Amino acid sequence: LRALAQAMASDPLVVDDLDLADIATVTRVEAALARSEVVLASASTEKVATTFRGAISTMREREALVVLWPGMRPADQAAGMSLRSVTDPRAMTLPGRGALVYRGTCLPIQIVLPRPEDNDRPIEHPV
């Protein structure tokens, strides 16, 4: 989330673990969404799949989603569509493996960590 926030032109509201956030944080997220501001948030796949109102639901309906481990059971429900086409059955739980879901389309992605000793360039591993 931090890397995405740094790449944004405006200052987004960044919330880690929105599903565990207090009411004040959730209220700030809902207000930012109502003003069409950029919000970057993370939440558990299970909670995203089973929440039908509030900030998590609004973001799931309107925004791009990054779903990690797209082959696991609640991922399709969280995304609102089948993620089978972007799931590698040989690497269901490979760290950082995911899907980018936006407006009815999905793309496979691989999230990587930056190398601190190398100006935050990503660590590249063959997959």
Map each language-model feature to its residues:
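Conserved P-loop NTPase "ATPase switch" module shared by AAA+ and STAND
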Residues: 1-26, 38-42
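Phosphate-binding and hydrolysis-coupling loops of NTP-dependent motor/remodeling domains
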Residues: 10, 42, 50-127
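Short acidic, S/G/P-rich loop/turn micro-motifs used as interaction or catalytic elements
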Residues: 18-25, 45-50, 72-74
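Conserved Walker B catalytic segment
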Residues: 21-35, 53-56
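Structured helix-beta-strand junction loops
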Residues: 35-36, 62
